[in-house]
Every structure is written in C-alpha cells, then in structure tokens.
Amino acid sequence: MSHSVKIYDTCIGCTQCVRACPTDVLEMIPWDRCKAKQIASAPRTEDCVGCKRCESACPTDFLSVRVYLGHETTRSMGLTY
C-alpha cells in the first residue's frame, strides 16, 4: 500500500524529520524562503512504511511534514492546508 508524504511551507529546515525516517524517504533540498535555506523533500515516497516518525520528530506547532496512510487525504481527514 502506498503512502503520501507532504511537506508544507512551515518547514523550518531543522532536519529532524530526515534523521527520524528509518527508510530514507526524506532529504533536504535548497530553499530560500526559510531561515535555514533548506526544506525537507520526499522524493522516495514509495519507500514510506507509514511509521510517522517524521511527524513525531517535527518541532513546529503546525506539523510541516504529514504522512497520509493508503487512501487518507487531507480532505478525508478533515484537514485543509
């Protein structure tokens, strides 16, 4: 079952989610719109196991990284960003 990993622009570039991911789904890429000049990216979502460790590691009040398991979407979960 495939999972969707979304990175939102509230990412502060701290790398916590990247370090927490056991399957290396996430990586940091250059991005000029935050203080750290980098943002998380999810180029390998097919490797996501749905553990949500990246979500747990995110220090922002509004989770910058979200994992949607299988058929979950922002709409089905009642979330709109």
UniProtKB/Swiss-Prot annotation:
[4Fe-4S] cluster 1 binds at residues 11, 14, 17, 58. GO terms for biological process: photosynthetic electron transport in photosystem I. Its main location: plastid. [4Fe-4S] cluster 2 binds at residues 21, 48, 51, 54. It catalyses: reduced [plastocyanin] + hnu + oxidized [2Fe-2S]-[ferredoxin] = oxidized [plastocyanin] + reduced [2Fe-2S]-[ferredoxin]. It comes from the Eukaryota. GO terms for molecular function: 4 iron, 4 sulfur cluster binding; electron transfer activity; metal ion binding; oxidoreductase activity. Keywords: 4Fe-4S, Electron transport, Iron, Iron-sulfur, Membrane, Metal-binding, Oxidoreductase, Photosynthesis, Photosystem I, Plastid, Repeat, Thylakoid, Transport. PROSITE patterns: 4FE4S_FER_1, 4FE4S_FER_2. Pfam families: Fer4_21. Binds 2 [4Fe-4S] clusters. Cluster 2 is most probably the spectroscopically characterized electron acceptor FA and cluster 1 is most probably FB. InterPro entries: 4Fe4S_Fe-S-bd, 4Fe4S_Fe_S_CS, PSI_iron-sulfur_center, PSI_PsaC. It is a peripheral membrane protein. It is an enzyme of class 1 (oxidoreductase). Its EC number is 1.97.1.12. Residues 2-31, 39-68 form the 4Fe-4S ferredoxin-type domain. It is found in: Plastid thylakoid membrane. Its cofactor is [4Fe-4S] cluster. One of its GO terms (cellular component) is chloroplast thylakoid. Disulfide bonds: none annotated. The eukaryotic PSI reaction center is composed of at least 11 subunits. Apoprotein for the two 4Fe-4S centers FA and FB of photosystem I (PSI); essential for photochemical activity. FB is the terminal electron acceptor of PSI, donating electrons to ferredoxin. The C-terminus interacts with PsaA/B/D and helps assemble the protein into the PSI complex. Required for binding of PsaD and PsaE to PSI. PSI is a plastocyanin-ferredoxin oxidoreductase, converting photonic excitation into a charge separation, which transfers an electron from the donor P700 chlorophyll pair to the spectroscopically characterized acceptors A0, A1, FX, FA and FB in turn. NCBIfam families: PS_I_psaC. This is Photosystem I iron-sulfur center.
